[in-house]
Amino acid sequence: MDECVVDAAAVVDALAGKGASAIVLRGLLKESISNAPHLLDAEVGHALRRAVLSDEISEEQARAALDALPYLIDNRYPHSPRLIEYTWQLRHNVTFYDALYVALATALDVPLLTGDSRLAAAPGLPCEIKLVR
């Protein structure tokens, strides 16, 4: 895969995961040009906080993941009016947050790399979805 949009579920797994999917995701992201909406940083921070509070990862692991985050994503995109409009059109199939990733992948004509099986199973999405679990 040359280029992709990557969502927060995939990024959190790549940064803080310990299983086979984390290894696969790290490899895919290293070899690809990765894109994401600006929302990604807030979602990753939120997920890492939850993981620390539930003792899934340590504070140090979360800090290391946050420190690595800026270098993992090649291009971040603002929530432009055009992207928001297209995101809103997808509201019947996925959450607004997930739709931002789908809309960006569609606009860039690249696959969406996700660790979210519910997103991957959503019907009628206009972009290719690659689930890594």
Curated annotation (Swiss-Prot):
Activity regulation behaviour: Inhibited by EDTA.
Positions of transmembrane segments: none
Gene3D superfamilies assigned to the protein according to its UniProt record, in alphabetical order: 5'-nuclease
Enzyme Commission number: 3.1.-.-
Broadest EC class assigned to this enzyme: hydrolase
Residues noted as binding Mg(2+) in the record, renumbered to the chain: 7, 98
Alphabetical list of Pfam families matching this protein: PIN
InterPro entries per the UniProt record, alphabetical: PIN-like_dom_sf (IPR029060), PIN_dom (IPR002716), PIN_Pae0151-like (IPR044153), TypeII_TA_RNase_PINc/VapC (IPR051619), VapC_family (IPR022907)
Any one GO MF annotation of this record: magnesium ion binding
Domain of life: Bacteria
Keyword Hydrolase assigned: yes
Cofactor: Mg(2+)
Keywords per UniProt: Hydrolase, Magnesium, Metal-binding, Nuclease, Toxin-antitoxin system
Family that this chain belongs to: Belongs to the PINc/VapC protein family.
Function text: Toxic component of a type II toxin-antitoxin (TA) system. The cognate antitoxin is VapB1. Has ribonuclease activity.
Name by which UniProt lists this protein: Ribonuclease VapC1
Organism: Mycobacterium tuberculosis (strain ATCC 25618 / H37Rv)
